[in-house]
Design a protein with these regions (language model features):
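Conserved alpha-helix/loop element of class I SAM-dependent methyltransferases that forms part
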Residues: 1-25
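A short acidic, Gly/Pro-enriched loop at the edge of an enzyme's catalytic core
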Residues: 79, 83-92
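A short SAM/SAH-binding and catalytic strip from SAM-dependent methyltransferases
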Residues: 90-105
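A short glycine-rich, Lys/Arg-flanked "PGG" loop and its adjoining helix->strand segment in the class I
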Residues: 105-120
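Conserved class I S-adenosyl-L-methionine
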Residues: 120-145
Length: 193
């Protein structure tokens, strides 16, 4: 399975954060530019996807048809996970979709509600340090001015009863000496209700 965590960085085949998804219920929270729910469905899971963009949903449905897999698609805010009952989901993946969320704690509470106890929530996002720099490596923003800081992210997960068990800071494979990691990937596990 090849879950996409960002351009030119390691994917699921190398990081192994999701495990075997066959027979599991998996939600892609925000459709990635490489739709992960297709790979999830190809891996034998019941794949579900939620995205606020109607065009992303339409493109995902067409891709699912081309790959001859079924993906249950839902259009709505990333916190609108009402289609899944409490403690019924085995894995949630959000690849580069949480940065634009206005109310991250609300999204995390809803993900916590639908996940089974101990189930993982895998999140990939632009690394908070990478947001500080322009493409020529000049300083563009102060840390935290353009995105969440790592401590903001960590505390939001802690306050919603998640525990990080894996953190990866990934660098673009094309660069020889990167000034900062480009992608932050975390796996958080749902603690008790």
């Amino acid at each position: 399975m090849s879950i996409w965590y960002g351009a030119n960085v390691a994917d699921e085949s190398e990081l192994r954060l999701c495990g075997d998804v066959a027979g599991k219920r998996v939600i892609e929270l925000g459709i990635a530019s490489h739709p992960n729910s297709i790979d999830i469905a190809l891996g034998g899971a019941k794949a579900m996807a939620l995205d606020p963009d109607v065009q992303a949903i339409t493109a995902l449905r067409a891709a699912a048809e081309r790959h001859e897999v079924k993906v249950e698609c839902h259009q709505g805010d990333l916190a609108d996970i009402g289609f899944a009952t409490s403690a019924s989901v085995d894995l949630v993946i959000a690849s580069h979709s949480l940065a634009a969320v206005d109310d991250l704690p609300r999204v995390l509470r809803q993900v916590h509600r639908v996940l089974k106890i101990g189930a993982p929530f895998v999140v990939a996002m632009q690394h908070p340090v990478a947001t500080m720099f322009a493409t020529d490596h000049s300083l563009r923003y102060a840390y935290g001015a353009a995105s969440l800081t790592f401590s903001d992210l960590y505390m939001a997960f802690e306050r919603t009863n998640f525990r990080f068990d894996v953190v990866h800071e990934l660098s673009d494979r094309r660069g020889r000496d990167p000034i900062a990691p480009t992608v932050l990937v975390v796996r958080a596990r749902k603690l008790g209700d």
